[in-house]
Amino acid sequence: MAHKKAGGSSRNGRDSEGRRLGVKKFGNEAVIAGNIIVRQRGTRWHPGTNVGIGRDHTLFALTDGRVQFATKQGRAYVTVVPAQDAPAREAAE
């Protein structure tokens, strides 16, 4: 005879994995066309100049350049300043 009652199994102990959302390229960072700048759910950040938006609201660079974040009328925008317009930081270093 068993001297202890069999323990029940827990039905907890699992969680979904994180979705790896957020800003991937920050302000003044260099990007090339096609680079993902922001992965998001919904439009927390809106696409500005030279930035495209994917079906899942991912923002990506349409041209080579540098990332800029700006707020206009309560909306956050992400733009890419083309490489020839941006100050050449690499040349100075």
Swiss-Prot record:
GO biological process, one term: translation
Keyword Ribosomal protein part of the UniProt annotation: yes
GO (cellular component) term, any one: cytosolic large ribosomal subunit
Alphabetical keyword list: Ribonucleoprotein, Ribosomal protein
GO MF annotation terms: structural constituent of ribosome
Pfam families for the chain: Ribosomal_L27
Superkingdom assignment: Bacteria
Record carries keyword Nucleotide-binding: no
PROSITE patterns: RIBOSOMAL_L27
Region listing for Disordered, in residue ranges: 1-22
UniProt similarity note: Belongs to the bacterial ribosomal protein bL27 family.
PANTHER family linked to this entry: LARGE RIBOSOMAL SUBUNIT PROTEIN BL27M, RIBOSOMAL PROTEIN L27
Name by which UniProt lists this protein: Large ribosomal subunit protein bL27
Upper classification of the organism: Bacteria, Pseudomonadati, Pseudomonadota, Alphaproteobacteria, Hyphomicrobiales
Gene that encodes it: rpmA
